[in-house]
Structure formats: C-alpha cells, structure tokens
C-alpha cells in the first residue's frame, strides 16, 4: 500500500497543505514540500490534532443549529401576537413619520467613525526564498512596502516593490527590525543529484558488489586481463585489437560478485576513463612489466587519485623474458604508489593476463579492499545510477547501458535518464540474458527511453510516469536553452579571439559515430590538437550514419565530416560529391587524430586513396557445409569486382572489413558484376551475413604526388 502524501491528507481533512506542513515543523519533523510522504506515526499525531478540532467544530455547529431551530419556533408564535399590535401601532406610527425622518438625518451625522485596525505585530523570525522581492519581504515583516523602500534608500539602494533582494540586504533590513531571518532551502526535483545519497548510515543497507575499473596505457593488456578473468575473448573482435567502448561485466569469485568496467586505455578516451573513475570503487592500474610507466599510465593515476579511489597495481606480462617488475615499482613510487613490501600502502600483484598466473591473487586483493571499504546499498530504495554507454539501434530504438548504484531497477519502471525519459521496455544483463530486476552494482542494457542519453548521465526511477515525463521534458528544455546560451557565448568569445589573433583559421569538424562514448572521446582528442595558427572547432556531434543534413551543415560551414565506425547513406554520398564536401571514414581512432594533425601541420602526403566502386544488397542467404554462408546479392550501384576489398554495412554501421572469397554469376566464376545484375558472394573468414546487409566494394587507388 502506497504512503499518503501531505497534500492528500490535507485534502481529506479539507485543510491547506501549509497548515499540515506548519504543524509537522512544530513537531520537529523535517518537511521538504507538500509531495512528501507521511509515516504512520506522523498521521496518527496529525489525526489527534486536526480530527479532534474538527469534532469540536462539528459539535459547536450542531448546538448552534438546535438553538436556531428553537428560536425559529418561538418567533412563529410571537409573530402572530405581533400582527395585532402592529395593526394598532400603524395608526400612531403615521404621525411619527416626520419625526423619524428628522431623526435619521441627525443619526447620519452622529454615526461612530470606523477606528483604524491595530497594526500587525512584527514576527521574531521569518524565512525567505532566494530572489524574494521588496513587496514579498514587507508582507512577511507585516510592514508597508514603502517602509522597506525608504530603508533601502538610506542604505544607498534605489529599489521598487518588485526589486529582488540579496542575502546581505535582507539581513541588514531584518537586523533593523530586530528580526531573525533564515533562507529556505528549495528542493529542485529536476536536479537528479539530490536522489543520490550515501547509504552507509542506512540501517536497511546491505553489502553490494564492488565496481572495479581497469585502467592503464594502450596495449598493456587491460582487455586481455578482463578476458582472462571472464574466460572469454573480446580483444580479437575489436578494430586494431584495441577496446573502443566501455563494457561492463559481472563475475562471481568465492561467492561474491564483482562488477568490472573495461575502460579503454588510449589517451583519446580520457573522458570515458574519467567517467569510469566516477562510478568505480576500486581501480586496477595495469602496467606492463616490460614497458613500465607510460603517459596514459600517469593519466590513469591522476584520474583515480582525483576520484579518491583505492588503486591496486597489476604488473602484467611477467612471463616475458624482458620483464622487470622491480623497475615498474620504482617508477610508480615517483607518483605516490609505494608497494606494501617497501613500507607503503599500495597493493602490487604480479601476473600474466595471457597465461592466467596471478589472476586469483588479484581477485583476492579486490575482495579484501572491498571488505575494508564497507560498500553498501539499499535494494528497497528507488533505483539510481549512471549511464555507461548509449546508442541508437535502428530496430530497438534508443538504448543505454546503465550501472545501478542504489535501489532495484525493474522492467516497467518510469525512468529519467539525463535529459530524456521513458518506461523500461526490456532489460538485458552482461551475458545477453533478458532479466526483470537488477540490484545495486549490476550493469544492464535497457530500451524504452525516447532519446539517446549522454554517456555519464545519471538516471533516477520515479513511481509516477507523469512525474518522470514532466521532469524529463523540463530537463530537455533546460538543456536546449543552455546549449543556445553556450553557443552564443562561444561565438562572442571566438570573435574576440579572432580579433586578437588577426587571421585565425578554424577547422570546422562534424563527428558521427556508432556510440556516444566514441563520439565524446574523439571530440575531446581533436580539441587537444595544438597547431599554431589553426584551431579545431567541433560544430556538431551525433550517433548514427552520416546523412544529407550533415553534408549540408559541412558545406555551409566549410567543414569536414569524420565518420567513426559509420558509413554515409546513399543520399549523403551524392550530396557530398555534388557539394565537394570532404568525408573521412575511420575505424581506429589513432588514424583519425594522426590524419587531422598531419593535415593541420601541412605534412599530410597520402600515397593511396580509397575509392568505392560499387554496392550490392544481400537479398537472400544460403548456408552450405564446408563453404560457409553464400549471399545472393543484387548490385545496386557501380560494380563488384573479384579482387576488390569489401566491407559489410548493417544499419549504417560497419560490421566487418575484409576480402571477397568468391564472386559468381549463376554457377560460373565472374571477374566483375555490373549494376542491375544478380550475383553470389562469399566473404573470406566471415559468415554472419544477413538479409538487408549492404556489401560495399572498394579499391585503393594511388595518388600522384
């Protein structure tokens, strides 16, 4: 049964919510607003006060009604007798009419004058809200507004009745009247941070799994370490063997669960790593024993220290002949990470992620550190947490990977996620299994929200869908206003900078990516490129395939488009060719940064250029033993040649890039198949072809220097 709120209780007793709030405050009960739920003991106390008063009022009104009815009965009897007397007196009254008229004139002059109302007493204490006006403050003090205006004038402040007062002025005026003032703290329900509370003091809080972030320099073995822990292989599926997105996984060790956030290690993902440190309880710093401390290692240390998160150092690759764990320990002491063996407090675990040696020791250390931290959460509370990743899926719509930090998340919950909202339609765990509930420290992917949130946004569950909609829409509108204000400010700032620097050149960039985290990280990396005389200006970022709107914007702003793991649709391709807009498509983030930086320095001297020669649509698939998947295709653009490179595109996102294995027309091998013809295609080392996929053929053409 849901608890009764203050306004509902007031409505039941036909009272104002303010009366109930005032009474609760007199009982020393903290009240935020009329939406606050009442406990059973609070309702009983209020019943004693207000229902007793109402009984007395009802009793008094009943007595008055009895008295009134008795008086009416007596009056009826008296009226009969008075009729006779009136008839007799009428004759005498006619003679007195003149005298009465004269008396009325005299009485008008002799009427007692209305006495002025007694002045209201000035209260000893008043409360006020930020932005209170002169008129409102005068009403609280029970004085005329003109009095306040005079006092302000004497203080050298010219104000009118609608002028807002600051804290200092309010205190000066109140002091003049001998009144104590206190500012009311107004709780803004749109601020999601107010729903995040420390659960250590909650008597109902129970132990929760630790959230662990793996950090370190690129290629030091972070993903391999996580794979070794989960007994899975993720690295092989990543472009260039490097983790591109934050993944959240949960494992069980000695009966206790541990949640891992796999944060990419390259400097380009600084923003993602910083976000990981904000939600984590323990940081695993992976350092290769044969490589030592590198720039991203230092960056990871700084992020963990800033978030005040305990660090466990995993010295990886100890099985290599060139490994030197002692050198790693020595180098890390310069950054305040002193091993326990050397009298410090930092735990060092030597291990090999590839062979699995030392993994059990690492998990044991994580358990010990988590035990000392006393990590707790209350699964009975409303669910709150953070967005790990978000993307737009063509079939499922907007989806978000969430980490539940407190409470329990359920399918069907009304939820506000950042500046968007919705009702959870489906929930999937890290193993891809559909689940109905998710407790604290559990990573899940949800669908049912109406827009793609930002990675790192907070989410809060509300019991009322209307409230969630109202808060979500309000936050969305506020974010639009803020973006407009920021864009105006940035424009003015840029104009001033241009005036100072003279002929300043801007490189306008539009970034489109497959997931929000990659887009954010790429934008942050490009903004850090420091080339004298040229500034990178990110004019638009979004998730999804490159479309005609992006090309139009790039053309209007004289900018370039960077596609990260996405492809342009056919309309965007035609528009880019017609408008001569430069589109750069990449799958590995290093190449983007290197290419842009080289171009800005004037050092870019490409030897080869990719040229798309055709596209074919997969109409039907056939699985043949010892051959694999054969795709029955229809060439929609250009031509498909046997020696061309190919990439598989699904919903605008690149799924695979490789080589053609076979190209056939009916049962015969073909060197090329032109537009408008059907063909059979098999892809080398790839069988996950589906109907509707687009096979794009390309060639590398040498560019003359």
UniProtKB/Swiss-Prot annotation:
Residue ranges of domain tr-type G in the record: 207-376
Protein localization: Cytoplasm
PANTHER family, per the entry: TR-TYPE G DOMAIN-CONTAINING PROTEIN (PTHR43381:SF5), TRANSLATION INITIATION FACTOR IF-2-RELATED (PTHR43381)
GO terms of biological process kind: translational initiation
Region (G4): 316-319
Biological role stated in the UniProt entry: One of the essential components for the initiation of protein synthesis. Protects formylmethionyl-tRNA from spontaneous hydrolysis and promotes its binding to the 30S ribosomal subunits. Also involved in the hydrolysis of GTP during the formation of the 70S ribosomal complex.
Family: Belongs to the TRAFAC class translation factor GTPase superfamily. Classic translation factor GTPase family. IF-2 subfamily.
Renumbered residue ranges of the record's region G2: 241-245
Molecular function via GO: GTP binding; GTPase activity; translation initiation factor activity
Species: Staphylococcus aureus (strain NCTC 8325 / PS 47)
Positions with biased composition (Basic residues): 94-108
Region (G5): 352-354
Amino acids binding GTP: 216-223, 262-266, 316-319
Region (G3): 262-265
Entries under PROSITE patterns matching the protein: G_TR_2 (PS51722), IF2 (PS01176)
A cellular component annotation (GO) from this entry: cytoplasm
InterPro entries: EF-G-like_DII (IPR053905), IF2_II (IPR044145), IF2_N (IPR006847), P-loop_NTPase (IPR027417), Small_GTP-bd (IPR005225), T_Tr_GTP-bd_dom (IPR000795), TF_IF2_bacterial-like (IPR000178), TIF_IF2 (IPR015760)
Lineage: Bacteria, Bacillati, Bacillota, Bacilli, Bacillales
CDD domains: IF2_eIF5B, IF2_mtIF2_II, mtIF2_IVc
Pfam families linked: EF-G_D2 (PF22042), GTP_EFTU (PF00009), IF-2 (PF11987), IF2_N (PF04760)
Region (Disordered): 40-124
Region (G1): 216-223
Protein name in the entry: Translation initiation factor IF-2
């Amino acid at each position: 049964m849901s608890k009764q709120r203050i306004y509902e209780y007031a409505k039941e007793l036909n009272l104002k919510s303010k009366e109930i709030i005032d009474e609760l405050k007199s009982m020393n009960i903290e009240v935020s607003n009329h939406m606050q739920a009442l406990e059973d003991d609070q309702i009983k106390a209020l019943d004693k006060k207000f229902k007793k008063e109402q009984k007395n009022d009802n009793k008094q009104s009943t007595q008055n009604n009895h008295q009134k009815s008795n008086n009416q009965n007596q009056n009826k009897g008296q009226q009969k007798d008075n009729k006779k007397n009136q008839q007799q007196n009428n004759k005498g009254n006619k003679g007195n009419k003149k005298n009465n008229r004269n008396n009325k004139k005299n009485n008008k002059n002799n009427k007692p004058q209305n006495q002025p109302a007694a002045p209201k007493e000035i209260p000893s204490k008043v409360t006020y809200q930020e932005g209170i006006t002169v008129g409102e403050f005068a009403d609280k003090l029970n004085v005329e507004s003109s009095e306040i205006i005079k006092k302000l004038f004497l203080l050298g402040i010219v104000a009118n009745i609608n002028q807002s007062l600051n804290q200092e002025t309010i205190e000066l005026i109140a002091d003049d009247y001998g009144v104590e003032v206190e500012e009311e703290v107004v709780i803004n329900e749109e601020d999601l941070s107010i729903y995040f509370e420390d659960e250590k003091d909650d008597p109902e809080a129970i132990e929760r799994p630790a959230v662990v972030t793996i950090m370190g320099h690129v290629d030091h073995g972070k993903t391999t370490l996580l794979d070794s822990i989960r007994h899975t292989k993720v690295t092989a599926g990543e472009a260039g063997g490097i983790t591109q997105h934050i993944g959240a996984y949960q494992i069980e060790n000695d009966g206790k669960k541990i949640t891992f956030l796999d944060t990419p290690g390259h400097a380009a993902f600084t923003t993602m790593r910083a976000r990981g440190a904000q939600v984590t309880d323990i940081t695993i710093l992976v350092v290769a024993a044969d490589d030592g401390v590198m720039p991203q290692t230092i960056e990871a240390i700084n992020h963990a220290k800033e978030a005040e998160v305990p660090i466990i150092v995993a010295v990886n690759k100890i099985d290599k002949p060139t490994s030197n764990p002692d050198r790693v320990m020595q180098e890390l002491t310069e950054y305040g990470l002193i091993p326990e063996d050397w009298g410090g407090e930092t735990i060092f675990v030597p291990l090999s992620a590839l062979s699995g040696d030392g993994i059990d020791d690492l998990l044991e250390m994580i358990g010990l550190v988590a035990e000392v931290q006393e990590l707790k959460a209350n699964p009975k509370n409303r669910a709150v947490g953070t967005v790990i990743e978000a993307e737009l899926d063509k079939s499922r719509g907007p989806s978000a990977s969430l980490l539940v930090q407190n409470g329990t998340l359920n399918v069907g919950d009304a939820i506000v996620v950042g500046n968007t909202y919705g009702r959870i339609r489906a929930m999937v765990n890290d193993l891809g299994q559909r689940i109905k509930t998710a407790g604290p420290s559990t990573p899940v992917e949800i669908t049912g929200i109406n827009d793609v949130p930002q990675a790192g946004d907070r989410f809060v569950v509300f019991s009322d869908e209307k409230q969630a909609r109202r808060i979500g829409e309000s936050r969305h509108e506020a974010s639009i206003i803020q973006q407009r204000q920021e864009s105006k400010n940035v424009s003015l700032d840029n104009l001033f900078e241009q005036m100072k620097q003279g002929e300043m050149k801007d490189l306008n960039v539009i970034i489109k990516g497959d997931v929000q985290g990659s887009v954010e990280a790429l934008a942050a990396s490009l903004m850090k490129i420091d080339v004298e005389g040229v500034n990178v200006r990110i004019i638009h970022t979004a998730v999804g395939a490159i479309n005609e709107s992006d090309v139009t914007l790039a053309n209007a702003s004289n900018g370039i488009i960077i596609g990260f793991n996405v492809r342009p649709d056919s309309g965007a391709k035609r528009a880019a060719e017609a408008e001569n807009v430069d589109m750069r498509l990449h799958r590995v983030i290093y190449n983007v940064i290197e290419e842009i930086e080289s171009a800005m320095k004037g050092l870019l001297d490409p030897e080869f250029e990719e040229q798309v020669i055709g596209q074919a649509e997969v109409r039907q698939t056939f699985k043949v033993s010892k051959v694999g998947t054969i795709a029955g295709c229809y060439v929609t653009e250009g031509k498909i040649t046997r020696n061309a490179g190919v990439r598989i595109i699904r919903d605008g996102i690149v799924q695979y890039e490789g080589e053609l294995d076979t190209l056939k027309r009916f049962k015969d091998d073909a060197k090329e198949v032109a537009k408008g013809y059907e063909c059979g295609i098999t892809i080398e080392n790839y069988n996950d072809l589906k109907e509707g996929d687009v096979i794009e053929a390309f060639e590398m053409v040498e560019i003359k220097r």
